[in-house]
Regions:
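Short coil/turn motifs at beta-sheet boundaries
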Residues: 15-17, 61-63, 72, 101-103, ...
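Generic detection of well-ordered alpha-helical segments
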Residues: 31, 75-78, 142, 146, ...
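Short, surface-exposed coil-to-beta transition loops
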Residues: 19-21, 75-79, 101-107
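Glycine-rich portal/gate segments that line the openings of hydrophobic small-molecule binding cavities
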Residues: 25, 54-99, 154-159, 163-164
């Protein structure tokens, strides 16, 4: 049985016009996946469209309450880590700099399996900016996360193979 997302009240799926989930079994360890997800320098290697991640609190890796700026979904985004449980779950919430009233909350759960781990990612989005983007390409967010999971898995498997 997999865990559930700990949604902030305001960002629960029942309150969000955009909500999607993606999952994937990965033949890589929880530790490798966690290292990639929490290392901002690694994101451009697997996160579609991400060219940079800047941590704003002097940290070198994501941790509880870390604030950061990046470019997600073609948008310059300000975000902060709102849930952090090492090796198990991480979530961040934020908004595009050009539309502060359009919010997003993106959560991850990593569960060990016999052959590696199970990745579950779920996101909710609210506000006119995200809604307009979804109208233009209804499946874009879900498809981007499908690519994200596949690319993250490929990088993780390659990293483990290089250590063998």
């Amino acid at each position: 049985m997999y865990e559930t997302i700990h949604w902030p009240e305001a960002m629960k799926p029942s309150r969000s016009p955009i909500h999607f989930t993606n999952e994937l079994e990965v033949a890589a360890s929880v530790e490798t996946i966690w290292d990639l997800l929490t290392d901002p320098a690694a994101w451009p290697g697997f996160y579609p469209g991400v060219q940079h991640v800047q941590l704003l609190d002097g940290h070198t890796c994501f941790g509880a309450d870390t604030r950061f700026e990046t470019n997600l979904a073609g948008q310059d985004v300000y975000a902060s880590v709102q849930e952090y449980e090492a090796m198990t779950r991480i979530a961040w919430g934020g908004y595009p700099k050009i539309a502060e009233h359009s919010k997003a909350y993106h959560a991850w759960i990593i569960t060990p399996t016999a052959n590696g781990c199970h990745l579950w990612t779920e996101e909710t989005m609210q506000g006119p900016h995200w809604i307009e983007l979804a109208k233009q390409a209804p499946d874009i967010f879900w498809l981007t996360h499908e690519k994200l999971l596949k690319d993250l898995a490929a990088v993780a498997v390659a990293r483990e193979a290089s250590r063998a």
